């Protein structure tokens, strides 16, 4: 976690953590949507940069991993009677995506950097939430 804390410019506010704990169904729905979006982004990059073998390999691995996580979260939701719905993107992710540059080379770099920030933030948040979640969610 030290590397993640050094990478992120600030910690998630405790108010976000309290709100997430108070509404765990939305937390799970949002997490499933984030996993799906990450997989879709990886697949989109595979289409756009199909002549880049290294990128194809990494994005293929990422898409599979994110879809597996999506499936796992949706299963947890189903076990808890939580209906999957699509939520609008968070302001955090939307704000980061809004600064992605348009020229092709810069756009790829920006998309990868934004993805790294979103993934790091997710890790940071779940590390803080985990001790306060039930056993099944802690293991996930």
Residue map of PLM features:
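Non-heme di-metal
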Residues: 1-140
